[in-house]
Amino acid sequence: GVTVQVWEKEDRRELRFGNHIMQSVFSKIRPDHLVLPYSRFMMLGLLFCPEPKSVLHLGLGGGSIVRWMHREFPELQQTIIEINSGVIEAAHRFFDLPRDKRLRVLCADATELVPTLAEKFDLIILDAFGDYGAPEELTRIDFLHKLRACLHYDSWLVGNLWTVTGDFEEMREQWKSTFSQVLEARANQKGNMILYGSQLSKIPEKKEFEATAKNLQRHHQLDFRKMLRELNKVF
């Protein structure tokens, strides 16, 4: 399995895997802050679902997104599937992931567990990374179809993809053949591209999301309006 490392720094704690790529960052000064830009862009999915009641996460990392959503949405039920028990242990022990009845953390292989899930979710957050990018079996079209089956008609899948591995274009094509609507936002210059997919037959123009972005920004203290400018439809 992947070696889990926790790096202790003066003002922050980092979760890294064997190759030293930073997976998650926890600010000791602002423990609930989403430090890494990509994690904030994952939350841009709230534009399409401003008050989620149920979220499925594939991949836990340090749990910063899970923790943030847990605090911001007091009614939210979250299910997390993480294959590495060491990651789950580290998230609870070093990254303040609470043990709470609203958080169901399952140590399992998502490819095996997802098809057995009976419920549907408002949002699915696909953020599973190994040593070198997303595990291939989680980016294949048959798995995307299984995720689509766990969504309501108007729900969204939000995925963190790596543009530097050479197969990004192919992965984006698979999203396009799985979902009627696909949008993308470049989260940073390092190569994180966030994709948003839904079965909706049509979605509003970008400018029509302005009011939602403004409202989300007021309630959740993330710069949704700035992030909205990076959002583009994939044709």
What are these model-derived regions, one by one?
Residues 1-10, 14, 22-29, 46, ...:
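SAM/dcSAM-binding transferase cores
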Residues 8, 33-153:
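The AdoMet/dcAdoMet-binding core of the Class I SAM-like
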Residues 17:
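S-adenosyl-L-methionine
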Residues 20-24, 129-132, 157:
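A short, flexible beta-alpha/helix-coil linker loop
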Residues 30, 131-135, 159, 163:
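Conserved short-loop catalytic and cofactor-binding motifs
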Residues 75-77, 100-102, 154, 179-181, ...:
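A generic structural signal for alpha->beta connector loops
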Residues 141-204:
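C-terminal substrate-binding/active-site "lid" region of AdoMet-derived donor-dependent transferases
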